[in-house]
């Protein structure tokens, strides 16, 4: 469930009847919703459910500040468990900046290049459903001729379609997965050897002149 659903569950049933533990996965993807969800869960544990277990998981988070926070609020002993991860060498290549108007054409060409130069499945990050459908049309001929399965992955897809994108192809075909950043940190897709990131995303932006919030295609930036 999402943090928003958890919040509504606590509002409707503050004791979280029938729930023994809450797992906060990928907690390094900090947001106001995840922080608020953890705060509410700690409040439930301290005030109503001293048996409620909270598990916070992350592959990259600095655990010390979080452990200090939990020690200050949790009624149960805070235990830190660490497991060794696996690292693989990654060859990073950059192309010139791609403008929005040429996004579909340039991405399609990069996919064709990756198909010819590399084995394994290809994961492509695109801004949204529109660009995903456009790229899928552009590479349809390539996919048909090379016996490649093209899968799409975005939030509005049904569960079965999302599972088809994540799971190995039942016929053993090579896959090209066209995805929004839904798969960037929260999913593991086996078999992927090439990742193409367009560095564009659709983000909700508020426009004060019209008092409307709308999806805007913009570059992804760490600034």
What are the functions of these language-model segments?
Residues 1-223:
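P-loop NTPase motor module signature
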């Amino acid at each position: 469930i999402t943090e928003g659903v958890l919040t509504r569950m606590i509002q409707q049933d503050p004791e979280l009847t029938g729930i023994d533990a809450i797992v906060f996965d990928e907690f390094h993807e900090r947001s106001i919703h995840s922080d608020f969800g953890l705060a509410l869960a700690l409040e439930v544990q301290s005030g109503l459910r001293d048996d409620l277990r909270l598990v916070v998981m992350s592959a990259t988070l600095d655990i010390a500040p979080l452990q200090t926070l939990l020690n200050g609020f949790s009624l149960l002993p805070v235990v830190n468990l660490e497991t060794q991860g696996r690292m693989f060498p990654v060859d990073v290549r950059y192309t010139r900046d791609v403008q929005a108007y040429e996004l579909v054409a340039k991405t399609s060409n990069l996919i064709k290049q990756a198909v010819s130069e590399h084995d394994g499945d290809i994961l492509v990050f695109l801004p949204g459903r529109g660009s995903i459908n456009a790229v899928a049309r552009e590479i349809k001929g390539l996919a048909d001729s090379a016996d490649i399965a093209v899968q799409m992955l975005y939030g509005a897809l049904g569960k079965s379609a999302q599972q088809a994108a994540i799971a190995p192809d039942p016929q053993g075909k090579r896959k090209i997965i066209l995805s929004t950043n839904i798969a960037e940190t929260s999913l593991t897709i086996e078999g992927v050897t090439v990742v193409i990131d367009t560095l564009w995303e659709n983000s909700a932006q508020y426009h004060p002149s019209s008092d409307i919030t709308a999806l805007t295609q913009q570059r992804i930036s760490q600034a």
